[in-house]
Amino acid sequence: MPHHHSLPTSSADFGDFNSAPASSIQTSSLSQDDLLGSYDETIRHSPSVKSHPSPDPRASNLDLLFLDHNAEEHRRPEPTYSPRSRPTGVLPESVPHARSPRRLSTFSSSTSPTSPPSITDAGCDIIFHPFYDHMDVNATRAMQKMQGHGERGASKRSDKMQLRGQASHSRIAPSSSPPHSRLLDTLATTTKLASKWRSVIAHPTSPNTADQTHNGQPKPQIRHAETSPMDITHDTPFASAEQIAGSYIPPTGAPGFTQASVLGMKHHGDGPFEPLTLIGRKDSTSNVLTPEDAIGLKACLPPRQRLTNQWTLLFSLDQHGASLSTLYRLIDIYSVSHQSSGNILVIRDGHGNRFGTYMNEPIVKREGTYYGSGESFLFKLTHSCQTIPYRWTGKNKYFALCEAGFMSFGGGAGAYGLILDSTFTHNSSATCPAYNNDILCELEPLKSQHAQSFQCLGLEVWSTL
């Protein structure tokens, strides 16, 4: 090999240094296409990579300062790759461990940062994760031999794996259980607790376990007699003896209130009502309602309307004239200061029959709408000063319909219990579903939806408060 002498070279910046000797070996130059295409060629020819001896290190010393980019013949040789060496710890014939045919459960551990991991026995079996030691070749071969056994040896292999897993479990950190494993553990714990409670309830045990006598015979169980229900002897302030016995009287205005219940009612103990005073009627006025009739009507009124012993005349056909508008106006004036007052309208026809209606509120004009409540009723007055009321049936709520041209009380099915026009000249009565009343202008009881007309010779409206 020829000997080359280094040429001394100086520089103001770096000082004295010697240049590298020129190589006698012809170097190959790389072009831009070579650098870009080398990677593609490597990928394209990767399946057929051949091993080549590594080039001489002396030939790799290229003079990068004198590259010839125009020389096509000097290209970079194709890269060569040597196959990766096989690890010495793994045998070529080693295969992954096959899954055991026996179904095993997993440990479940808590990964809470504030508490130590807790291990539960949810499935009553312990799963073993084999600890592979890559350096233990004999153990690997032994496991491969065990893989070839059939179902008869599977149980033995599982037992050995469980024993080995228990021994090596202290070295293996428990992995965090998935969410569904924690849910199954919770359900299993809850089921166990529930079964324990059921067993305790079904078979109660006393704290004293010594349930046997000195002779060894069990003690007889003592049954306690059941307590008989106590008889309640005191009276209740919410119901009378008659109501408890089944003779309940419905309140006034409620469906089912009958005349028999009215006759059996007691007022102020066993004595009659105090005398009722009728005010506002002139002495020269022909009366329609007498004080005796008023006492009978008062017994049919709601309890709050019985508190007063004085009724006030609001309208009289004999005193104020035959005008429905006047009737509305006078009642409206009085109701301003007596809003809770009820009104009683009493009529006398050409045959001397007296009848009318009670409204739990003032009789006023309300165009196109019914008003009133179940306390309202129609009534007839007999010649013996007895009152026959016709209570609300609950079939509808057509209590009163008062407009400028007429006023009616009770309705349904095209029939009106009592209807009067604006001049009180065209009037009629029929059986209506709201009250199921008899025809009011008939002396004898008669029910018919065919209206019977009558002449209005007298009409009065009274305020009960």
Curated annotation (Swiss-Prot):
Pfam families: TLD
GO terms of biological process kind: response to oxidative stress
UniProt-annotated location(s): Mitochondrion
PROSITE patterns reported in the protein's UniProt record: TLDC (PS51886)
This protein's UniProt keywords: Mitochondrion
Biased composition (Polar residues): 20-32, 165-179, 205-218
Stretches the record annotates as Disordered: 1-61, 73-119, 144-183, 203-223
Ranges annotated as biased composition (Basic and acidic residues): 148-162
GO cellular component, one term: nucleus
Biased composition (Low complexity): 103-113
Entries under InterPro entries matching the protein: TLDc_dom
SMART domains: TLDc
Residue ranges constituting the TLDc domain according to the UniProt record: 287-465
Function text: May be involved in protection from oxidative damage.
Family as reported in the entry's similarity comment: Belongs to the OXR1 family.
Protein name: Oxidation resistance protein 1
Organism: Cryptococcus neoformans var. neoformans serotype D (strain B-3501A)
Upper classification of the organism: Eukaryota, Fungi, Dikarya, Basidiomycota, Agaricomycotina
Gene: OXR1
